[in-house]
Amino acid sequence: MKNILEYLEKSAQQYFTKVAFTDENHEMTYGSCVECSKKIGTALLELKAKRKPIAVLMDKNVESLTGFFGVVYSGNFYVVIDCYMPKDRIEKIFETLKPIALITDYAHQELALSLHHKVYFYEDLMTTKINQVALDQIRNQMIDTDPLYALFTSGSTGVPKGAVVSHRNVINYASWYK
């Protein structure tokens, strides 16, 4: 395996109608997760970017997970932004990260629009028609050392520091548990 999406899709083939993720308000099947993620990935293709950071500013819920996978389907990497962290900390992360876009939902619209000029709303992304041909083209260009996500810590100096994690890093870690 060279891409974390292969794990998701393999699980979806085996357990299409089984619940993959739950939170206190929703549950999502593997099939729905793949479908929603591909819609997001298709919409993000308009950015014409690869291996670039895209921030995801949403509550910790099943929808945010499809945001992460959707970014990956687009050939880019995601950065989780906690909606409850202070705005100045988010701004410092954005100064370092320079994300090309921000995914959020309407619940966080005001904050999102104050942070970035290119904002995608989850609710709108769910109306996107999946372009499987374009997603396949992007996938064929991906390699295992491509970034999957960036994680920011507080940093000892008070300036957030980021670490980028590749598909290979996560695949190796997951394989270790088999």
Please place each PLM-identified region on the residue numbering:
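Carrier-protein-dependent adenylate-forming modules in NRPS/ANL systems
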Residues: 1-169
